[in-house]
A protein has these predicted regions:
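Cytosolic regulatory regions of ion transport systems
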Residues: 1-399
Length: 399
């Protein structure tokens, strides 16, 4: 890869932007030197590991990230001629019917989910979520006023010590453990069960970790560890120790057992898994897995987006990291009072009141209407919903 970068940059006159995947993090600094400011470098291990952790924390998150990373639905774009100079960020969130304003670029600094009172200027470039950048041309202003008398609990919180189970071990696992620790409240626990590898743990602050070497396709082993009290389950593939199809086959067997056990104990804890071969993702759906992260597929989506616009690098870094604002799916009653005829503009206003940015909704009703995992991203402000207990609002929030 280093030689390829040298070949692309040695003449110096070309300003074409380059996006490169880094397999070995030891090559990162050298690649930065060769790239000479023209190259966006994507650390594959970091990207996949962080996405695994983000999606394991809440069911439906993978559907949100997939929507934001690919080109089939609504994704990130940048809006320069927005006409909102002098408006606050809270007002900007409600300004357009079919566009979700989620932040702005101020000079070289990207800010997602800024304080609602932040005043925009003509020099600010908006970060938005929209179906296509062509939809920004002549975008109509929203005429839907939020129903402020329908707002919900402003101070809702669900932070508590968590119990996580990590099945399997590979080169990305130490990063997964590190990221789990960053999100875990003090007093949380993590159990690692693996057939291969000798887990070496990073320095941890919040997690108490136990490690067991055992056969992860064994029903007896899984019966011992897959319990109703778990908050999240992650299954990693053995791509370091086995060939692709054998590793995926073992992952699928593990997933089948895990789902069967969870069904018997009456738990709906999210199960997130890696799958090396994208073709095996269809088979994984038979196991009723909430969110399957396919390493190669997600990296390809991110690389494609970055090649289109280098400004996305800062956006992706923030939403995949533990610092700044990232994706959360939180109880809808925190934002609006459950009931009929709730406009999306009202939900957006409820999120703004909590210093959060609403970008979507998760509901069983949406699942019955064909939305993947019951999740819709960037609904029109004028869209009307029936909000029920168990529904969740997708937001950008700092914690």
């Amino acid at each position: 890869m280093i030689k390829s970068l040298l070949a692309l940059t040695h003449q110096g006159g070309d300003t074409t932007r380059i996006v490169a995947e880094i397999q070995d993090p030891d090559n990162l600094e050298a690649a930065k030197l060769v790239g000479n400011g023209r190259t966006t470098l994507l650390d594959i291990r970091e990207t996949v590991a962080k996405l695994v952790v983000q999606t394991s924390r809440q069911s439906g998150a993978a559907a949100v990230y997939t929507e934001l990373f690919d080109y089939e639905g609504d994704e990130f774009y940048f809006y320069e001629d927005h006409g909102l100079a002098g408006s606050t960020y809270a007002e900007a969130q409600l300004a357009f019917d079919a566009v979700s304003v989620v932040g702005f670029i101020d000079g070289s600094v990207t800010k997602l989910n800024p304080p609602p009172s932040t005043v925009l200027t003509a020099e600010h470039t908006l970060v938005v979520i929209v179906e296509d950048d062509s939809a920004l041309s002549g975008q109509s202003r929203s005429r839907t006023e939020p129903a402020l008398n329908r707002l919900g609990e402003q101070l809702g919180s669900d932070e508590h010590p968590t119990q996580a189970l990590l099945i399997g071990w590979n080169d990305r696992a130490p990063i997964v453990v590190r990221e789990l620790d960053r999100y875990a409240p003090p007093g949380s626990t993590l159990t690692i069960v693996t057939t291969y590898g000798e887990p070496e743990l990073p320095p941890l602050t919040n997690l108490a970790v136990t490690v067991e070497k055992a056969q992860t396709t064994s029903r007896a082993v899984l019966d011992k560890h897959v319990v109703a009290a778990l908050d999240q389950i992650i299954v990693l593939c053995y791509d370091r120790d086995l060939d692709t199809q054998t590793a995926d086959s073992r992952t699928l067997v593990t997933l089948l057992h895990v789902r069967d056990i969870l069904g018997k104990v009456g738990s709906d804890v999210p199960v997130v898994s890696e799958m090396i071969d994208d073709r095996n993702r269809v088979l994984a759906s038979v196991a009723d897995v909430d969110d399957v992260v396919v390493s190669g597929e997600i990296v390809s989506l991110v690389v494609t987006q970055l090649s289109e616009d280098g400004r996305l690098e800062a956006v992706f870094k923030e939403i995949l990291g533990a610092e700044g604002s990232e994706v959360y799916l939180r109880p809808a009653e925190w934002y609006v009072q459950p009931g009929d005829d709730i406009t999306w503009a009202t939900v957006v206003a409820g999120a703004s009141r909590r210093n959060e940015t609403a970008i979507g909704l998760k509901s069983p009703l949406l699942a019955r209407e064909g939305q993947r995992f019951g999740v819709v991203v960037n609904p029109p402000k004028s869209e009307v919903y029936t909000i029920s207990p168990g529904d969740a609002v997708v937001v950008f929030a700092e914690d």
